[in-house]
Amino acid sequence: MAMEKDLLLTCDAGTTGCKCTVFDARGEAVCSVRRSYPTSYPRPNWSEQDPQLIVEAVFGCIRELLQQVSPQRIACVGLDGTMNGCIPVDENGTVLHPNIIHSDTRTEKQVNEIAGVISQKDFYRLTGNRIDTHYTLPKILWIKENLPEVYRKTRWWLNTKDYLYGRLTGRFGYTDYSDASLTIALDINNRRWATELLQDLGVDAQRMPRLLAGHDVKGRITRDVYHATGLITGTPVAIGGGDGACTARGAGVYLPGSGYTYIGSSAWVSQITPAPVFDEEARIFNYLDMDGVSYHVCGTVQCGAAAFDWTLKNLLGGDDGMMEISRVENMARQIKPGAEGVLFLPTLMGSRTPYWDANTRGALMGFTLYHDQRHIARAIYEGIAFALNSCAEIMTECGAPIRSMMLTGGGARSGLWPDMLASIYGLETRVHKSPGETTSLGAAIAAGVGVGMFKTYEEAAGVVASRSSHPVNPVWQEAYAKYYPLYKGIYQQIKPTIDGIAALGL
């Protein structure tokens, strides 16, 4: 008797490693396996990964998972991965150069070349994004100019999960709408490649991958993959989406005004909208959802929990190295909102939303001999929360206020951030039931829609649950209404000094 195909298997290809998870039809994680892989930094500002090592890690995870569940129960495989990458492959899917990943910023020259062809304003209206070094299009230009033989042989420009899709199914040259958007080579208004822009830049639009919705099931597991992993030949594979799009779906976001906050090494605030949300100052950005219909509007804090971790290690560690997070939270709770005047600007890796200034440095200010580690701890939490609020505030200014908020990512495990964010946002904030599984759950939802386990993304949102709800604290809210404007003023006050430091080549 054949087993019921009642499970979904997801492959999440992240920056530091991959995680493969099996979900049931209720959105519950049945089992999960992680493996790491390296990032190389061959020169300053360069960040690369070997796609083959990612595939080996994913295949290894799948083999381990299938020791715990029968492969005959897997109804579909769903994928997600880091966005903004650049993997050139030939017509056979052979990798021609390591993946130039999202954190690579070698392309200042190419960014200026794009800006010479189209104004920043027109580019933003066309693609929903700024011209910036983190995205794929400048990386394609860099390869064209510096590795002409690689460019000549390239048939497709892929992101991480697109390459993985090709290796699983034998079908290379596909991407979904979310990853396509953050190549910054897509006309997001018309949902097609920006062929005129590409032509003006001398880039062959025919080498951009074909567009699929994340739930489209056009590929199936090959016999070679069966031998490598144990997945049954012919098992459907949904291409899924970029990690940002999958996180939104895994957070249950599908209605306008319903948003989420993600706190990981970086952090962001996002919501799904029926149309792009444009800001006159281009402080927020847009990309298509993996469904190919809806849009995500997003504001990103470049250094989220990474700023918190740096502070723990370097300012709050004492003689024994990094202080326990629970102890830091207890310290921070002893201090009133506003940290009695201590303020923190968490721009330790430059800034995206709202300043978009790569030279920006972090700042900790307002302390005196009276203040101690408890004030610093409180200020760090508040600085990151204030930075996230600036993202939500811009959306409100643009006519797209968030009315409900889900918190996810590693920061959602904090006992302090949910209360703090609720009072700073002025919005009841829920914490995701499984904050570490949100992105993978989004990939599972796409796969489930693809094989009919869920009729629609909206129906699938019903499997998303929260574990706690945090109301606005009126006393905290009143205090933050006084301190947030002071926080917002820091950047402009210190910018001349920051620019002076940058002029020294530091």
Tell where the protein language model's regions lie, with residue ranges.
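A conserved helix-loop-beta module that forms one wall/lid of the active-site cleft
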Residues: 201-213
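Extracytoplasmic/secreted proteins and extracellular or luminal domains
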Residues: 67-70, 204, 398
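N-terminal glycine/serine-rich phosphate-binding loop of ATP-dependent small-molecule kinases
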Residues: 1-97, 125, 153, 226-227, ...
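Short, acidic/turn-prone active-site loops that include or flank metal/cofactor-
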Residues: 35, 40, 100-107, 180, ...
